[in-house]
Amino acid sequence: MSAVPWIIKYRPKRVEDVIDQEKAKEVLIPWIKKWLSGTPPEKRAALLWGPPGVGKTSLVEAICNEFNLEKIEMNASDFRRKGDIERVAIAAATKKPLPPWKGRLILLDEVDGLSPRGDEGAVAAILELIKKTKNPIVMTANDPWGTHLRPIREESLLVEFKRIPKTKAREFLLKICEKEGVYCEKEAVDYIIEKNKGDLRASINDLQSIAEAYGKVTLDLASALLVERDRVLTPWEMLQSLFYSKYSWQARKAVTSTDLDYDTLFLWIAENVPKQYGDDPYDLWRGMEAVSRADVIYGRIRRTMNWSLLPYFFNALGPGVALAKTKYHKRARWSYPEKIVLLARTKEERRVRDELASHLALLTHSSKSYVRREIIPMLQFIAQVNPNYFARLALGLRLSDPMIKYLAKSKYQLVKKYVEELKSSRTVKAEEQTKAKEVVKELKKEYEKGTKKGKGEKRRKGSDEGSGLLKWLKKD
């Protein structure tokens, strides 16, 4: 057997060697070819996302080999700060490679490893990199749906990678054993694949570890040696595992194997229990009773900060919900929690509200909470009952157009019209005042000129009249 790790030895050298992922290839290869033709695509970066061990990085490396591209790779640990990206990635992305390379590809691996708070400036630097690049940028992520990664998603071509089918993974592992001259049972390979949840990279590592230690791979050896790896479940996988759990330990593992925070986990389950159990009133009642119990426990934890109650929260949400059913129900159409969807829709409106509260708090020397509670509702009421007066207030308070729109709601167009009229009338008044000042200046010049000459009583009299007019204009 080879001393080289099998994941390196049997890594795909060509695009066609990458197992499955045909849809991903159909999207990514034409995108790369556009770069090589000298006409960069509209999306200057590609974001490859999917479960671990399905071939995201392998496909990128195969593309580099096949198209003779120089690969500049950075891991999440290499671009924690803005300076890290500016020092390496931006410099590489804006320059051409030396021969014999035909081009250069920038690979940012595991961008979902960036912390929304800890990695200051990294996301902004990646966006700057995408804007400036003269070479294709490819990023990989297991879960790209974090809110801090939204700007990157919007600027990238999203390429999804599916889990590798069990039959194709089995065929590949058996082929490795054949090339290495290792006896291998099909049942053992199936067991390894199931333990690793379709992660081909982890399956190859386990296969090699057993083969090197015992010279063969059997089901008895695999079941005795391999420990199931903990894997983070997506919300959809968590629901699938929860609603179809047979035992309480399976249900508890489902709700504790996701990286959702406690509030969001509760919302996901509370939203989808009625959808899953809705065809049976008794199961629905028992399921929602478990959800209600979890809500009470979590409320008690929040009030008293007694986190020793957390296991009871998980027991209510996990086994409590899963074992509420008296039969297995057909899979329902699960959905995102309505509260999360609503918050996403109103994100911009809440941002304007917070800016308005900060602006008015500064003007009125009040707290933001007082402004939100007392002043904003009053302004909204004025906008509805007296749009003309509200327009004057808006100008006086120097409110921006989004703030006016937030306060005026349905009367926005009418208020906007009044604001424009007030602005134009103020402009006219300002012009009239400017003209009056110019007249005053001219009269003052005439007066000074007449005083200097001092010829005759008539001129003095005229000067006095001019002075009187000057005083009257100033008074006006």
Swiss-Prot record:
Residues 452-461 have a biased composition (Basic residues). Keywords: ATP-binding, DNA replication, Nucleotide-binding. One of its GO terms (molecular function) is ATP hydrolysis activity. ATP binds at residues 50-57. Residues 447-476 are annotated as: Disordered. Disulfide bonds: none annotated. It holds the Pfam family RFC1. One of its GO terms (biological process) is DNA replication. GO terms for cellular component: DNA replication factor C complex. The keyword Repeat does not apply. InterPro entries: AAA+_ATPase (IPR003593), ATPase_AAA_core (IPR003959), DNA_replication_fac_RFC1_C (IPR013725), P-loop_NTPase (IPR027417), Rep_factor-C_lsu (IPR023935), RFC_lid (IPR047854). It comes from the Archaea. The keyword Glycoprotein does not apply. HAMAP family: RfcL (MF_01508). Heteromultimer composed of small subunits (RfcS) and large subunits (RfcL). Belongs to the activator 1 small subunits family. RfcL subfamily. PANTHER family: CHROMOSOME TRANSMISSION FIDELITY FACTOR 18, REPLICATION FACTOR C SUBUNIT 1. Part of the RFC clamp loader complex which loads the PCNA sliding clamp onto DNA. This is Replication factor C large subunit. The gene is rfcL.
